[in-house]
């Protein structure tokens, strides 16, 4: 009986060691599940990605604006891709390929909704890492001015390793 317990403990420790040595990989454009952080330190965490349909879901934790808190808000969205089109002799091909992405957040009791639409591709101008570059629109029901219900800007999300 003691030998069986000792064997179980040794096996358990070996499995624990293997699991601890497996490093989590940062998300990529083709495997987007994971955390992505923008310049304001807000984080979108893509928890599920269905490659067949392109559906994504997860959570967004904002560190800017009225929604700044540690409370995560639900994210829904889509990714879509077509195969890269190589250049052909005598034909101006499309020389850059990117995954396309859109995701939305409803800010609950705050009443607003934000949507990001853009691309996920390698940023050749900086680190060479993949990143999400998107434009965003935020709509809010209560503002000081009629023109202030929809705000627009741009954002960049880098993978968190």
Where are these regions (language model features)?
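Serine/proline-rich low-complexity intrinsically disordered segments, especially terminal tails, linkers
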Residues: 9-10, 116
